[in-house]
Every structure is written in C-alpha cells, then in structure tokens.
Amino acid sequence: MEFVMKQALGGATKDMGKMLGGDEEKDPDAAKKEEERQEALRQAEEERKAKYAKMEAEREAVRQGIRDKYGIKKKEEREAEAQAAMEANSEGSLTRPKKAIPPGCGDEVEEEDESILDTVIKYLPGPLQDMLKK
C-alpha cells in the first residue's frame, strides 16, 4: 500500500512538508541575490527615467522648432498674455470687466412687448380699450 501511495503522489511528498510550513531549505546567498536583484531593478528604473527625459527633451526641441518656424506661441504664453491684457483693462476697477452688449439687443424686446400689448388691447371691448390706452 505504501508503494502505491508513493507512486501516486510521486515526488510531491517531499514538497508537502514545505507547503504545510515545514522546514524550508535556506539558501545562504539568498540575501545577497535579493540585494543584487533590487539593485538591478533600481538601475533599470533610473535608465528608463533617463531615456524618457532624453526623449521628451528631443520632442520639445522639435516642437519649439515648429513653433519658431510658424510663429506659434505656447499655450502658457498665450494664457499669460490674455491674463495680462485682462489685468491691464481692469486695473482701476474692483469688478470684473463687463461684456459689450451688441447694439439693438435690448431695443427689440421692448418693441415686441408693446406690439403684444397692442394686440391684446385690440381684442378687448371698446370701453376697456379706452381705459388701457390712457
């Protein structure tokens, strides 16, 4: 019976003790290997960051060349200029600058109100029309 169990489980019986929390084989160089692995990871991360920074600097140089060629300003520069213009307009004012109202915007509303009132008066009987027109 013992033979059959050994054959069925194979070499798993040796690992069974480890899985259940038994004695593990300790590698004397495990700490050294872990330290080397951590150092390799740190170096790889530094190389990746350096490569990314170099690539981003090259891209920015190309972008700046295109901006210079076509006279395009950076978004930050445009925003700074717009902010400076807004501050220059409102230096003496305590409130924000008012938006310009296009001509004729408010005038049309009053005319429409009068025409609606006239239309309503037309449908009223004569004596009421006289009272409302006064």
From Swiss-Prot:
Keywords carried by this UniProt record: Cell projection, Coiled coil, Cytoplasm, Disease variant, Epilepsy, Exocytosis, Neurotransmitter transport, Synapse, Transport
Region of interest (Disordered), ranges: 1-60, 74-113
Coiled-coil blocks: 29-69
Protein's UniProt keywords contain RNA-binding: no
Tissue: Nervous system. In hippocampus and cerebellum, expressed mainly by inhibitory neurons. Overexpressed in substantia nigra from patients with Parkinson disease.
UniProt-listed GO biological process terms: chemical synaptic transmission; exocytosis; insulin secretion; modulation of chemical synaptic transmission; regulation of exocytic insertion of neurotransmitter receptor to postsynaptic membrane; regulation of exocytosis; regulation of synaptic vesicle fusion to presynaptic active zone membrane; synaptic vesicle exocytosis
Gene3D superfamilies membership: Single Helix bin
GO cellular component, one term: SNARE complex
Compartments reported by the entry: Cytoplasm, Cytosol; Perikaryon; Presynapse
Primary location recorded for the protein, binned into one broad class: cytoplasm
Chain positions covered by the region annotation Interaction with the SNARE complex: 48-70
Database matches in InterPro entries: Synaphin
Positions with biased composition (Basic and acidic residues): 15-60
Tree of life domain: Eukaryota
Family indicated by similarity: Belongs to the complexin/synaphin family.
Record text on subunit structure and interactions: Binds to the SNARE core complex containing SNAP25, VAMP2 and STX1A.
Associated disease: Developmental and epileptic encephalopathy 63: A form of epileptic encephalopathy, a heterogeneous group of severe early-onset epilepsies characterized by refractory seizures, neurodevelopmental impairment, and poor prognosis. Development is normal prior to seizure onset, after which cognitive and motor delays become apparent. DEE63 is an autosomal recessive disease with onset in infancy.
Function comment: Positively regulates a late step in exocytosis of various cytoplasmic vesicles, such as synaptic vesicles and other secretory vesicles. Organizes the SNAREs into a cross-linked zigzag topology that, when interposed between the vesicle and plasma membranes, is incompatible with fusion, thereby preventing SNAREs from releasing neurotransmitters until an action potential arrives at the synapse. Also involved in glucose-induced secretion of insulin by pancreatic beta-cells. Essential for motor behavior.
Protein name (Swiss-Prot/TrEMBL): Complexin-1
Provenance organism: Homo sapiens
Origin organism lineage: Eukaryota, Metazoa, Chordata, Craniata, Vertebrata
